[in-house]
């Protein structure tokens, strides 16, 4: 019997981008690169070298020496230059060759690519633009004053390589209300997106599921208010306000990534926690460690999905799925020439998802799960 194919919706996987996103990309905490050694970073389909000069200023260059292709990240830092391990050619942070030790003269015009850098909140950023334009002041990553205040912990930082996925997979999460229930085991009772200019924001109120314990971002009877904003294509600041009964905890989560290739990226996340009054530093550190562990479990829940899903350019949506297509239009501004950015990519857009029906259905599921758990526990006790 022939299979009925009329009305079947096919998945359009589309094509991967032909360039990397324009914008600031976070490489990690400054302290990770400030040990006097050159560090390699695989990013944007190439390799970069990061090194600190004698004043502690961080510099980023193309990693491969323009002389004979040696890997500068395998070399050494000598004064204000990074020295190639192959023939000791010295390169300054401005990209100019400063010295060829064995030569009568150093080529005056010898240059490699030097990358724009910035430091915000103790984190190092590198600028990428397919057209080669310098960064504009209005898209600079905002400062994170809490990190400087002395009243918050230092960054608890994690990173991992995600292979087989494009960066857009993580961006889609900004509009995905329902995955908080199914992947992160919470009940999102309020969910709103606002996109404007180079910023995309998510506002969330989430309560824990009583039928789930110790699963990452599930917090039992805890309540969470969250404001999360992407500043450009790859760096999110997430202000988290957690309530556990009478106890309140303030924290900031950084959710960021940078592309390695078009189908792989490095996912990074970091947490700082406001030091609760009356707690000593050791206890505060334990609190920060515990919170970071929970956040890490949450990211790994997402990673498990990304590892096995397909890219889909034509997702089939229901009302509660929110502004997926609008989010992708916003994201597209970073993958076209500046002259080709259209108003629908940057004009202000707001959407609040009505979670009422979803929460009603989910609460029924939660109660059924609790009933089944109670019956299973009773049966186990009587056996």
Swiss-Prot record:
A family per Pfam: Rieske
Enzyme class (EC, first level): oxidoreductase
Effects seen without this gene: Cells lacking this gene form 4-androstene-3,17-dione and 1,4-androstadiene-3,17-dione from sitosterol.
Keyword Lipid metabolism: yes
GO MF terms held by the record: 2 iron, 2 sulfur cluster binding; 3-ketosteroid 9-alpha-monooxygenase activity; metal ion binding; steroid 9-alpha-monooxygenase activity
Entry function: Involved in the degradation of cholesterol. Catalyzes the introduction of a 9a-hydroxyl moiety into 1,4-androstadiene-3,17-dione (ADD) to yield the 9alpha-hydroxy-1,4-androstadiene-3,17-dione (9OHADD) intermediate which spontaneously form 3-hydroxy-9,10-seconandrost-1,3,5(10)-triene-9,17-dione (HSA) via the meta-cleavage of ring B with concomitant aromatization of ring A.
Pathway(s) it belongs to: Lipid metabolism; steroid biosynthesis
Organism of this sequence: Mycolicibacterium smegmatis (strain ATCC 700084 / mc(2)155) (Mycobacterium smegmatis)
Name assigned to this protein: 3-ketosteroid-9-alpha-monooxygenase, oxygenase component
Biological classification of the source: Bacteria, Bacillati, Actinomycetota, Actinomycetes, Mycobacteriales
